[in-house]
Swiss-Prot record:
Pfam families: Ribosomal_L27A. Residues 42-52 have a biased composition (Gly residues). Keywords: Ribonucleoprotein, Ribosomal protein, RNA-binding, rRNA-binding. This is Large ribosomal subunit protein uL15. HAMAP family: Ribosomal_uL15 (MF_01341). Binds to the 23S rRNA. GO terms for cellular component: cytosolic large ribosomal subunit. GO terms for biological process: translation. PANTHER family: 50S RIBOSOMAL PROTEIN L15, LARGE RIBOSOMAL SUBUNIT PROTEIN UL15M. GO terms for molecular function: rRNA binding; structural constituent of ribosome.
Amino acid sequence: MKLFELKPAPGAKKRPKRVGRGESSGHGKTSTRGHKGQWARSGGGVRPGFEGGQMPLTRRIPKRGFKNINKKVYTEVNVEKLERFENDTVITPELLLKEGVISKIEKDGVKVLGRGDLTKRLIVRVQKVSEGARKKIEAVGGKVEVI
């Protein structure tokens, strides 16, 4: 197969409807729009969500909940992900980002959680650490520093 031999699959290209090209075409005069009315006009139609004057769904349903602007948001990392680092490595949010362990640092920083096992002795400097993670890090001789 060569580049010039490529062509669309059968039925993939549909000819556009040619309207307003004479009565004998079958799509002349009103160009398939019918007579007068909102839909016959240029720019005609209703805005999205308009239900003809009936109270729209978005206004019939009650409002619920809110966004708490004071909510703490952390990027979570389990101790099993820290197993890839060498002994005595200082683990910081920047290092985790650089090594691809996390894809971004959330506004309140990084929190280390306790899922998985850890055998390496690490120095972990992050914004928050769960109790289980702290025990696992310290059990293998590592240190936890909350920054």
